[in-house]
Regions:
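Beta-rich carbohydrate-recognition and catalytic domains
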Residues: 1-79, 87-136, 141-190, 198-246, ...
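Conserved active-site neighborhood of enzyme catalytic/cofactor-binding cores
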Residues: 252
């Protein structure tokens, strides 16, 4: 599976901007006009916020500023918000995101009629042993039968760096039943995290971050039931140079209206010591098959 890298989409912002240190974990939707809307995590060296950007046809990306700030839902996200996942619903937009309360990340939900002004709905699900020290990086998937929620769980092992992909299901998106871990670190992996799942022809494709402790690559797995996954290995690794020379992280894959597949992700250049991630993109040029 060969991707065509398109380079850097959004660099860290200017000094004093909310993404001046890093721009991370993008989530992209395409609207009816063909415009691309992005929500992403921005960090200024102190606080995570959720930011918004747009790319209209024939234009570059334009930053739209802060979509959601720390304390949006109250005490449960008072110290920062990040890792948005946005889906279109009949009533507007639904966002799942991570909020930090000063001790641990917890999953939250918010709704919006147009995707700009959001209404907080607080936390969802109690944490378990698999995400005892943090639940983050949610991915919402609506199938014909149910809603799925995939997310990263941190159990505190390996100095807090070990992560697994967990899943939950819901008939409507209002209440969730935990299914537990569906993808664990394998072999030399320290963490499997940051899931992004697409449903194509009744098959689920999970793009996720595979962390070996030194570099992060984007890996791919497939499933027909959402619970048992077949690993297909790395689909996009660090390039060795340029904006993603050291790491390719936190993917968001999107099937566009024309049927093609694009992916936005967080890149880290070789020599970076500040974790100054920037948002990059790649395109899958051929017919889609695993």
């Amino acid at each position: 599976m060969e991707w065509t890298r398109e380079g850097e989409t959004l660099s860290p912002g200017s000094p004093r901007e909310p993404d001046s240190l890093r721009a991370f974990r993008p989530w992209v939707l395409e609207d009816e006009s063909g415009a691309l809307r992005m929500w992403y995590s921005g960090h200024d060296g102190t606080t995570w916020r959720i930011l918004e950007a747009v790319q209209r046809r024939g234009e570059g990306w334009s930053r739209l500023g802060v979509a959601m700030g720390a304390g949006f839902a109250g005490e449960s996200d008072a110290y920062g918000v990040h890792s948005p996942c946005v889906v279109k619903t009949p009533g507007g937009y639904l966002m799942a995101y991570a909020g930090f309360d000063g001790e641990a990340d917890r999953l939250h939900m918010a709704t919006s009629s147009e995707g700009h002004e959001w209404v907080a709905h607080g936390t969802i699900m109690q944490r378990g042993d698999e995400d005892a020290v943090g639940a983050s990086h949610p991915c919402l998937v609506m199938t014909g039968e149910r809603w799925w929620l995939f997310f990263s769980g941190y159990d505190g092992q390996q100095n807090g760096r070990r992560a697994t992909v967990l899943a939950a299901v819901s008939p409507s998106g209002a209440s969730w039943d935990r299914l537990g871990t569906v993808l664990e670190p394998d072999g030399d992996e320290l963490a499997a995290s940051h899931p992004c799942v697409l449903e194509i022809a009744r098959t689920l494709y999970m793009f996720y971050a595979s962390d070996d402790g030194t570099h992060v690559s984007i890996a791919l797995a497939t499933s027909t039931d959402g619970i048992s996954w077949e690993r297909l290995g790395t689909t996009l690794g660090p390039s060795g140079e340029g904006p993603d020379g050291l790491s390719a992280h936190a993917p968001c894959a999107l099937r566009l209206n024309d049927g093609s597949i694009r992916m936005w992700y967080s890149g880290l250049p070789v020599g970076d010591t500040d974790l100054a991630y920037r948002i990059c993109s790649a395109r899958f040029p051929g017919p889609w098959s695993s």
